[in-house]
Amino acid sequence: MKPEEIERMRDEALAAFAAADSLDALQEAKVAHTGGASPLALANREIGALPPQAKAEAGKRVGMARGAVNKALAARQEELEAERDARVLVEEAVDVTLPHDRVPAGARHPLTTLSERIEDIFVAMGYEVAEGPEAEAEWFNFDALNIGPDHPARGEADTFFVQGPEGGAESGVVLRTHTSPVQIRSALTRELPVYVICPGRVYRTDELDATHTPVFHQVELLAVDEGLTMADLKGTLDHMVQSLFGAEMKTRLRPNFFPFTEPSAEMDMLCYVCKGASVGNPDRPCRTCSSEGWIELGGCGMVNPRVLTACGIDPEKYSGFAFGFGIERMLMFRHNVEDMRDMVEGDVRFTRPFGMEI
């Protein structure tokens, strides 16, 4: 093994590394000149066949050549990696002066916003917001409200009943059909006088269509104090409607029957579109109120003495009034929403126009 042959192998390897212009090309050169089948590797294996006096000299020369090759390989790899990193930094550079992509602003659901708007109106009047469980005992949902066992509302055609243990038929629990149970809980647990507003989800066995949904939202109000009359109820209703629809709005009460109030009434408000001008005027029909001039909002009345007694309140000393209405219905009035399904399907095209305020 001649010294010039070892030098030639070394020089060929160094030249191949220097000529590599990428890490992939360098890898190919590495395999060719430092791998198990490379010339220097083969020369190293041939040393064992040399005469004893030539082994030391040949081994020294091959070792020095391989050391130079490995050093050159490491240096060239470091250079190519530095070039690659510099190129990536340039190619992936971010121009921080460019305008960023605008993220679409979200919007709260209008039902939530309207519910909180109504709460704010009554909180400003001194009422407290009260909440209760949605899976409610039948006593709170029916019995305490003077709704007897034979009342139609207690049938499966109107109410979701919760199964008993191990699939038993009766559990004494229903999905509340109104937020009135929160009124009962408030009257039982709070010191008199009681002034609470009770918003929340309620459940009825209705099919989802343009005007009905099995899950909807109510706001109910309860006031219990000494000397309250229907005049106080009427003034409270007027203030709520005027706060929501404008100072020119009016309300009226029509006699009705509810088991939990006596006397009871349906609450109507002046049509906010035609202001009553469509009544008897075929030239100016109003779709909102069907040219009747008034829109029904909900039920109200003075709390039935039996309900007060069920809550441990002396009906001879205290009186109270209550009312309730659906928030979905109120939203349909305020914004001419024609299909209740739009409120529950989660389509952002419905919520986006409302933004943060309504």
Swiss-Prot record:
Segments passing through the bilayer: none
One Pfam assignment: tRNA-synt_2d
Origin: domain of life: Bacteria
Reactions mediated catalytically: tRNA(Phe) + L-phenylalanine + ATP = L-phenylalanyl-tRNA(Phe) + AMP + diphosphate + H(+)
EC code: 6.1.1.20
Enzyme class: ligase
Cofactor(s) demanded: Mg(2+)
Subcellular location: Cytoplasm
Subunit annotation: Tetramer of two alpha and two beta subunits.
Protein's UniProt name: Phenylalanine--tRNA ligase alpha subunit
